[in-house]
Amino acid sequence: MRSLRIFLGIAFLFHTLYILGAGQLHLLPQPQQCILAKGYFVMGKMRLSTPVLSQEWKQFVTEMGGTLADQSASSINIKLIDTIENIPVNQEEAYRLTITPKTITVEAVAERGVYWAMQTLFQLKEAGGRRNRLQCCTITDWPAFRIRGFMQDVGRSYLSVEELKREIAILSRFKINTFHWHLTENQAWRLESKIFPMLNDSINMTRMAGKYYTLEEAKDLVAFCKAHQVLLIPEIDMPGHSAAFIRTFRHDMQSPEGMKILKLLLDEVCETFDVPYIHIGTDEVQFTNPQFVPEMVAYVRNKGKKVISWNPGWKYKAGEIDMMQLWSYRGKARQGTPAIDSRFHYLNHFDTFGDIIALYNSRIYNADMGSDDLAGVIMGIWNDRLIDKEWNMILENNFYPNMLAIAERAWRGGGTEYFDKQGTILPADEKSEVFSNFKDFESRMLWYKEHMFKGYPFAYVKQTNVKWNITDAFPNEGDLTKVFPP
């Protein structure tokens, strides 16, 4: 009996080590469940069986240093199944990944789950050090929230298509699945109009004049997002934030003439964007035409699109809008309408070292996971100030570190309290769960800074080892030559 107890104790210890070992693999976001096993899958000759993403899997094998063969004892097997047991939310993005010395097996309900499993495999490859082998393990994983995204305000400050693609591609490796494209602002209308080309004329832009996206570039970006399992949400802000529209047409959007023009532009937008949602803004404006918003929502819906709107903004009744995006502390989710939390998620307001702590620790809309009424979170860069270089836009907003923080929180769920309660300071107790969790995240994030973000604007440095000693003001009596005591 004593021997049995010792055996069970050792077995439990190794089981625990395998689970805790996931952190050593630098997976980000951390999977919901990860059990490590002994051994490695070595990439050599192997068979591939997959009903989806065949080209992507072939590329994966090549990048790992393997080759495909009709006959091999080693194999990669992708299986679409009806359900994965014990997944509480978002089955469509869930997956189970099993790696043994001879097989890699991915089980998922939909293509998206297969794609996220592949991103986990890429991270296992990168973290493992050796290019052609993967740690044996079983990972069961799913996102706590179905919307995990970022917004670029290109209406104020243009970003090249190449830069947008770079951000989308990089962040999809961390399971970010939504790109919100804020295309129009007071400064400029950045989407080409073939019906009204004067809308894109330099004379009607007050910042970065002449810079806009062609309709072909927009279509290409939609396709690029789809290839990376990212939902693109185009926003045409109305009736506020529309000075560029007024400069061009000499009509307010809420006027009869303005509404006629806007509907023609929406025809063009809906035809260009093969996406399910169109964002129509409706924030920070005085409504002078009570029919404007209901009529525009109905018009977009008749084009086969669902409509997203800011909150606070137009006061919708139940069923009048398909999704709301909360942009200030006054924004409130409503039963029956899915909500996106963007209230304290303004990267342009963030401090490099303080706010990332609050961002990582805070629960999304103070909830542990999403629901029918809580879709998720979108981080935003609002370019209120002109920053002329793309590099500086990304650097000064600390874009990538903050996006990795929200990538983990939106995927894992949970957290502690909310921004306005828990603050931006780490607890003094280094043994506390909050401190330990952030330290673990910081370690994994800095690993990616070193191994994946070389040459990219990534301003964050380690801070969990920094100790602050706050004292009273030094009584120098106004004499600046006095020396501060040791």
Give the label of every model feature segment:
Residues M1-L8:
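Bacterial N-terminal signal peptides that target proteins for export
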Residues N90-M259, K263-Y277, E295, Y299, ...:
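Feature activates predominantly on carbohydrate-active enzymes
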Residues G155, T184-A188, D237-H241, D283-V285, ...:
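Active-site beta-loop-alpha junctions enriched in small/polar residues
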Residues F245-M323, W327-R334:
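Active-site neighborhood of glycoside hydrolase catalytic domains
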Residues S328-G478:
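Flexible, acidic glycine-rich loops studded with aromatic residues
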Residues H15, L20-P143, C270, V307-W314, ...:
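Acidic, contiguous N-terminal accessory segments
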Residues R148-Q152, F179-W181, L232-I236, I278-I280, ...:
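Hydrophobic faces of well-ordered beta-strands that scaffold small-molecule active sites
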Residues T481-P486:
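Aromatic, loop-rich ligand-recognition surfaces of beta-strand-rich domains
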